[in-house]
Swiss-Prot record:
<protein>
    <recommendedName>
        <fullName>Ubiquitin-conjugating enzyme E2 35</fullName>
        <ecNumber>2.3.2.23</ecNumber>
    </recommendedName>
</protein>
<keyword id="KW-0067">ATP-binding</keyword>
<comment type="subunit">
    <text>Interacts with yeast and human Mms2, with the RING domain of RGLG2 and with UEV1A, UEV1B, UEV1C and UEV1D.</text>
</comment>
<dbReference type="InterPro" id="IPR023313">
    <property type="entry name" value="UBQ-conjugating_AS"/>
</dbReference>
<dbReference type="Pfam" id="PF00179">
    <property type="entry name" value="UQ_con"/>
</dbReference>
<comment type="pathway">
    <text>Protein modification; protein ubiquitination.</text>
</comment>
<dbReference type="InterPro" id="IPR016135">
    <property type="entry name" value="UBQ-conjugating_enzyme/RWD"/>
</dbReference>
<feature type="domain" description="UBC core">
    <location>
        <begin position="5"/>
        <end position="151"/>
    </location>
</feature>
<feature type="active site" description="Glycyl thioester intermediate">
    <location>
        <position position="89"/>
    </location>
</feature>
<dbReference type="GO" id="GO:0061631">
    <property type="term" value="F:ubiquitin conjugating enzyme activity"/>
</dbReference>
<dbReference type="InterPro" id="IPR000608">
    <property type="entry name" value="UBQ-conjugat_E2_core"/>
</dbReference>
<dbReference type="GO" id="GO:0010053">
    <property type="term" value="P:root epidermal cell differentiation"/>
</dbReference>
<dbReference type="GO" id="GO:0031372">
    <property type="term" value="C:UBC13-MMS2 complex"/>
</dbReference>
<comment type="similarity">
    <text>Belongs to the ubiquitin-conjugating enzyme family.</text>
</comment>
<dbReference type="GO" id="GO:0004842">
    <property type="term" value="F:ubiquitin-protein transferase activity"/>
</dbReference>
<dbReference type="GO" id="GO:0016567">
    <property type="term" value="P:protein ubiquitination"/>
</dbReference>
<keyword id="KW-0547">Nucleotide-binding</keyword>
Length: 153
């Protein structure tokens, strides 16, 4: 982790992510940019995403921790709070961000969002409508997309 212009906080958080990974989550910094992380989240058990391996990218802006990390899914996913570009609707990535939060908290919150989709605060209107009108069918579609796009690393 040789990047002397990185704030101590980012170095500490990165060391903790590597030495104490959260269950079902791996996050490793890019070799050429220590503010850019390659993330993998395993689909939570008993969710439509179970068995899936979801790739995400996380970037810490210059203003971090005063500004939230930028995170998006690289793996295609059928979820009311994630759009087709992989952007995530999560309050702590927007107006509820606090400098007290850490990268680890953000990743755990995204993992929790996979367990509990919220069609009442959607980023993808069509998927949210599908989820509200026929949840069982929407869950089946989410399982199918997980099988098609998120199986294997």
């Amino acid at each position: 982790m040789a990047n002397s212009n990185l704030p101590r906080r980012i170095i500490k958080e990165t060391q903790r992510l590597l030495s104490e990974p959260a269950p079902g989550i791996s996050a490793s910094p890019s070799e050429d940019n220590m503010r850019y992380f390659n993330v993998m989240i395993l689909g939570p058990t008993q969710s439509p995403y179970e068995g899936g391996v979801f790739k995400l990218e996380l970037f810490l802006p210059e203003e971090y921790p005063m500004a939230a990390p930028k995170v998006r899914f690289l793996t295609k996913i059928y979820h009311p709070n994630i759009d087709k570009l992989g952007r995530i609707c999560l309050d702590i990535l927007k107006d509820k961000w606090s400098p007290a939060l850490q990268i680890r908290t953000v990743l755990l919150s995204i993992q929790a969002l996979l367990s509990a989709p919220n069609p009442d605060d959607p980023l993808s209107e069509n998927i949210a409508k599908h989820w509200k009108s026929n949840e069982a069918e929407a869950v089946d579609t989410a399982k199918e997309w997980t099988r098609l796009y998120a199986s294997g690393a």
